[in-house]
Amino acid sequence: RRSSQIDDIERGLPAELRGAEIAYAERTFRSHRHRLVARLDRAYRTSAGVQLVELKTRPRDAVYMSDVIELSTQRIALQDETGETVSDEAWVVVQNSRSGSRRPSKVRLLGLSEIAAMRERYVAVVHGRVTRPAPARTPSQCDHCAHKTRCGAKYQDRA
């Protein structure tokens, strides 16, 4: 039974992470210094440090910028809370919701300055300090956003 659980966890992982120790799973980390909170799916301990893995289930085998932002925030929060070295590359493992197949994609994470700038922009928009915020490129990007109702009043296609 244990062997089948390990096989399922490792299914879809890149070869370099198969057999690696799971350092953290489904855990929340905080960076008080940068005022960030992130819940990571998995982090593996390797000889090069900790490597992040984000698991996604989607009908399309696609990696989005939001995945990179999420993993980049996880990296900052994990490093700040634990002091461990976290790789500036991570993996997004997409499980196809139709076929169940999994495919890993390596991504390069954003730096602290880029994430800090995004956080500052978010805070400015939420507090009304940005007079002309731009809507998301497509309405589907708004589907799960906490601010959808507020934006829907301004951008009629977001409601």
Feature names for model-found ranges:
Residues 1-26:
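Acidic-basic catalytic patches of nuclease active cores, encompassing PD-(D/E)XK
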Residues 22-37, 45, 80-159:
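Metal-dependent nuclease catalytic regions and adjoining charged, substrate-binding loops involved
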Residues 36-61, 71-76:
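Conserved catalytic cores of phosphodiester-cleaving nucleases, focusing on short active-site segments
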Residues 61-62, 133:
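Short, polar/flexible loop-turn hinges at active-site or ligand-entry regions and domain interfaces
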Residues 62-69, 110:
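Short alpha-helix boundary/capping segments
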Residues 68-72, 116:
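Short, well-ordered alpha-helical segments
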